[in-house]
């Protein structure tokens, strides 16, 4: 089986594929100081809890936007799986031209999302990823990565409110607000985040559409995608597994033929 690993600034998402089918996924916190053996213990425990074995893994592909973590993860793969993983980065075949001033600056996760979106929709698409940062990426109808937008993520904004104010509490769980007019502090912050980010998303998508001048499919992914999409009429689809699917596609384009 293929183990796909998406290492983000806040969380690391793992997906186990049997051919093209995602059979299980896990989400763990990204920790810069985690050792090789700590990764081994954690991932073996996750596998054991769901009836999988380290020996089941025949290949690994990794997308990582946290360079200090990558070396430990590579060594973990060699020690516990006896596998040299494929790392998404320069020199990897994505099948997608990247039109960016410096293509090396584009986060691996953004390219992986773009590859998955074009492979699935085959049309001009905007991918909105609600991660540590909220990103908007435009893929042309020819399957070209054309650039995008980076804005502060939802949790970054919440942490800023908590650390930069004296009386506002930390809020980590969000729900669809019953009303924009809230009656207590927590509800007020919840409404501000949900409706504020829905407005941000609609505003950026509208500006991108006006500038691009073509009809676009909009797909959202990331931890809070479904919640924000419920308040944003411009998002067409939500795919929680878009990044993992993109990693599988890129693996197929780079695996060695027997």
Swiss-Prot record:
Return the Pfam families for the record.
Answer: Pan_kinase
Kindly state which reaction or reactions the protein catalyses.
Answer: (R)-pantothenate + ATP = (R)-4'-phosphopantothenate + ADP + H(+)
Q: In which pathway does it act?
A: Cofactor biosynthesis; coenzyme A biosynthesis; CoA from (R)-pantothenate: step 1/5
Q: Where is the active site?
A: 109 (proton acceptor)
Q: Where in the cell is it found?
A: Cytoplasm
One Gene Ontology cellular component: cytoplasm
Assembly and binders? Homodimer.
Write down the PANTHER family for this protein, in alphabetical order. Answer: TYPE III PANTOTHENATE KINASE
**Entry protein name:** Type III pantothenate kinase
| Annotated organism of origin | Syntrophobacter fumaroxidans (strain DSM 10017 / MPOB)
């Amino acid at each position: 089986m293929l183990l796909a690993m998406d290492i983000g600034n806040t969380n690391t998402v793992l997906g186990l594929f049997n051919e093209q089918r995602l059979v299980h996924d896990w989400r763990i916190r990204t920790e810069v100081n985690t050792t090789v053996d700590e990764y081994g213990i954690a991932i073996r425990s996750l596998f054991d809890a769901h009836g999988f074995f380290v020996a089941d893994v025949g290949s690994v592909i990794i997308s990582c936007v946290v360079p200090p973590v990558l070396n430990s993860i590579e060594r973990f793969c060699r020690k516990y799986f006896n596998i040299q993983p494929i790392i998404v980065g320069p020199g990897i075949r994505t099948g997608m031209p990247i039109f960016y001033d410096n293509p090396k600056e584009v986060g691996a996760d953004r390219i992986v999302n773009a590859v998955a979106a074009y492979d699935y929709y085959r049309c001009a698409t905007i991918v909105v990823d609600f991660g540590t940062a909220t990103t908007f990426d435009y893929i042309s109808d020819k399957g070209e990565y054309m650039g995008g937008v980076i804005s502060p993520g939802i949790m970054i904004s919440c942490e800023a409110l908590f650390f930069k104010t004296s009386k506002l509490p930390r809020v980590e769980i969000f729900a669809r607000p019953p009303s924009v007019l809230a009656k207590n502090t927590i509800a007020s912050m919840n409404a501000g985040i949900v409706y504020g980010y829905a407005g941000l998303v609609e505003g950026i998508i509208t500006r991108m559409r006006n500038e691009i001048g073509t009809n676009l499919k909009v797909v959202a992914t990331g931890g809070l995608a479904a919640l924000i999409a419920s308040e944003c009429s411009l998002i067409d689809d939500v795919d929680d597994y878009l990044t993992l699917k993109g990693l599988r596609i890129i693996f197929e384009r780079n695996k060695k033929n027997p």
